[in-house]
């Protein structure tokens, strides 16, 4: 029903009788935190929903049915009295509605897109409402969406829905509401069938936490963004001139075709081919080339991406309000977008030609090898030191604020005035969860050790080496590679590439590892056997993974990553509850790290308490959480030291009165 000024009172009287509303907003853009607003609100009540569209900001020149501002205020007052709000990607709608007066904090939130993720097979990748409707009810069911969007594009209304008449947008929005309710009912039945009710309840609480994190946002130092981008441009100019001088002519370094032609002029051929059989000049191919020009090309491209992706978009931003998706990954791990904080480089970047030490070169070789093997390639062990030096511009996580030739993307993110960013980082979380799945007396002792080096312990158990032995470092790295290879489902071929050994040697080392780490092989084989026989498996929280039988080897990854993710969610919920009556808040969760913005007056008291809350978990797995202060930005970390609140006194005799 398209609500008009004449039918508004009747519509409001009807919907206010229901404690649960399904909502969908139409907007003139996506930036709820900035310039954009709703142009209309879709509401559905009842399990066989009666739907309404309340138009408020459609252009009057196109449509004269807009309701009046006091009626929007009245609708928000009525919505504030309902107890439960349902939506598809509901946080998006709620941010816009809160800008109009909705009070979110006391509501039960049900995000249907999370329900869809919990009840879909692992090979499903598309979770938009349209894609889900097609997949669930067939192509015809989604025809309303396809035809409406086609009309919106044709009339150039697509980027700003307020330009579209309410008579077109209203029925479209109501249909979205109808299908959101239908999907909720159908998938709720499937959720109960698969006994994932507790998992969904966890996700419901997490939705509140993520909503508050998105709303607060993280401040950005846009002056640093401009400064760092300027430094990169200068460095790119140096590299570009060096490349052109070597090749003998100018060309577009970001063009794979022109790069290929330039390298061929130097007698360099690609050893990597595309699917169509053409020469490839991506990172994997450049890593095979024993010539400095290849390293400089990679350096130029990387710096170009840093500048365009992570610096220039923030020139005019004061804060970032990313979208956290608790439906974005199969395992249950959070993903984020606009921007994707999970992809922010942790390392700093060196904009200079400082020669590397032999130890540094070994580290660089390891990084290149890992990057190449991740794409199924083989690392060229014969790269000269001169070439390796050109690949050494990527540093580690120890960013030096005073070093003019260093930049860090994490340096962009700073605390508000009177606050401190504090990092709570789980130490070797996935390894701990992995070990807990086949916990025995030996593993139990290992898990309960303080400051334990699991990879070193695994090397001792599997290969009989001890710290201080000449080959300890080599076997520790091997144990680490096999541990994560098992968790991520890496086969012997890929493991061999990472270790720089043959496929057979990698297989032999893996067998030795399994033999030394008692219970690990039985666990791995049981997971593969269970998935192969029934096509699904559940993690320790009861989260279901529907896995194609030919991907059974990925089962361990789903269990370990999924359990780690659910522990993080559980603990974030507890920290969020703890902070409700305080000034401090959770800002960001990336991988196994949680960043909180803690008010300086609370820093001493609540930081240790947050650490304790994060270390606890309902599974009883011994976890360690490292605490560091990020000052003056996320890029620079130091051990947590309590701030002294005592006034500083100076003895009178120590003052120079002259």
Where are these regions (language model features)?
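Nucleic-acid-processing active sites and adjacent nucleic-acid-binding tracks
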Residues: 48-85, 218
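Conserved catalytic core of nucleic-acid polymerases
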Residues: 215, 320-322, 326-329, 462-589, ...
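Conserved "right-hand" nucleotidyltransferase catalytic core of DNA-directed polymerases
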Residues: 1-54, 134-137, 141-405, 414, ...
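Short hydrophobic/aromatic beta-strand micro-patches
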Residues: 498, 595-599
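Short active-site loop/helix that positions an aromatic residue
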Residues: 30-31, 91-103, 115-120, 260-267, ...
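Acidic beta-strand-to-loop metal/phosphate-binding motif
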Residues: 22, 83-93, 421-423
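Short amphipathic alpha-helices in soluble, non-transmembrane regions
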Residues: 606-614
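Conserved beta-strand -> loop -> alpha-helix junction used to position metal-binding or nucleic-acid-contacting
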Residues: 103-121, 129-130, 451-457
């Amino acid at each position: 029903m398209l609500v008009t000024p004449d039918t508004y009172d009747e519509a409001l009287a009807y919907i206010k009788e229901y404690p649960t509303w399904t909502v969908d907003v139409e907007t003139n853009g996506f930036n709820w935190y900035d310039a954009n607003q709703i142009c209309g609100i879709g509401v559905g009540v009842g399990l066989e929903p009666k739907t309404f569209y309340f138009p408020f900001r459609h252009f009057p020149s196109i449509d004269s049915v807009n309701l009046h501002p006091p009626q929007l205020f009245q609708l928000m007052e009525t919505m504030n009295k309902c107890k439960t709000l349902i939506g598809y990607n509901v946080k998006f709608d709620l941010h816009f509605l809160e800008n109009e007066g909705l009070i979110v904090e006391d509501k039960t939130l049900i995000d249907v897109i999370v329900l869809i993720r919990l009840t879909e097979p692992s090979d499903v990748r598309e979770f938009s409402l349209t894609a889900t409707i097609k997949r669930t009810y067939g192509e015809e069911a989604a025809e309303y969406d396809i035809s409406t969007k086609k009309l919106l594009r044709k009339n150039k209304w697509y980027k700003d829905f307020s330009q579209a008449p309410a008579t077109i947008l209203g029925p479209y929005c109501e249909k979205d509401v109808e299908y959101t309710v239908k999907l909720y009912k159908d998938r709720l039945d499937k959720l109960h069938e698969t006994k994932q009710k507790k998992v969904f309840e966890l996700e419901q609480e997490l939705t509140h936490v993520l909503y508050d994190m998105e709303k607060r946002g993280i401040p950005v130092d846009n002056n640093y963004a401009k400064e760092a981008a300027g430094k990169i441009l200068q460095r790119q100019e140096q590299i570009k001139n060096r490349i052109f001088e070597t090749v003998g002519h100018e060309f577009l370094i970001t063009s794979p075709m022109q790069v290929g032609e330039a390298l061929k002029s130097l007698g360099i051929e690609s050893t990597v081919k595309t699917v169509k059989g053409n020469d490839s000049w991506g990172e994997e191919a450049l890593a095979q080339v024993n010539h400095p020009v290849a390293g400089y090309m990679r350096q130029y491209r990387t710096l170009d991406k840093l500048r365009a992706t992570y610096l220039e978009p923030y020139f005019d931003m004061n804060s970032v309000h990313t979208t956290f998706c608790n439906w974005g990954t199969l395992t249950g791990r959070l993903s984020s977008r606009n921007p994707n904080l999970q992809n922010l480089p942790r390392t700093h970047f060196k904009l200079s030609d400082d020669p590397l030490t032999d130890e540094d070169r070994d580290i660089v070789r390891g990084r290149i090898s890992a990057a190449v093997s991740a794409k199924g390639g083989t690392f060229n062990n014969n790269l000269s030191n001169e070439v390796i030096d050109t690949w050494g511009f990527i540093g580690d996580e120890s960013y030096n604020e005073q070093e003019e030739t260093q930049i860090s993307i994490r340096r962009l993110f700073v605390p508000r005035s009177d606050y401190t960013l504090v990092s709570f980082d789980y130490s070797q979380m996935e390894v701990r969860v992995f070990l807990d799945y086949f916990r025995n007396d030996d593993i139990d002792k290992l898990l309960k050790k303080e400051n334990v080096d699991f990879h070193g312990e695994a090397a001792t158990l599997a290969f009989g080496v001890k710290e201080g032995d000449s080959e300890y470092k080599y076997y520790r790295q091997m144990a680490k590679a096999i541990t994560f290879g098992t968790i991520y489902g890496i086969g012997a071929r890929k493991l061999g590439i990472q270790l720089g050994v043959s496929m057979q040697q990698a297989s032999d080392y893996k067998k030795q590892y399994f033999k030394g780490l008692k219970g690990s092989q039985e666990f791995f084989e049981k997971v593969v056997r269970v998935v192969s026989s029934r096509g699904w498996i559940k993690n320790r929280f009861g989260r279901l993974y529907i896995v194609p039988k030919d991907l059974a080897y990925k089962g361990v990854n789903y269990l370990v990553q999924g359990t780690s993710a659910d522990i993080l969610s559980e603990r974030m919920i507890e920290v969020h509850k703890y902070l409700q009556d305080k000034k401090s808040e959770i800002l960001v969760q990336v991988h196994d790290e949680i960043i909180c913005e803690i008010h300086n007056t609370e820093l001493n008291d609540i930081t240790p308490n947050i650490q304790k809350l994060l270390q606890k978990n309902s599974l009883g797995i011994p976890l360690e959480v490292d605490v560091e202060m990020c000052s003056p930005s996320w890029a620079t970390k130091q051990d947590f030291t309590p701030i002294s609140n005592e006034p500083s006194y100076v003895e009178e005799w120590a003052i120079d009165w002259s």
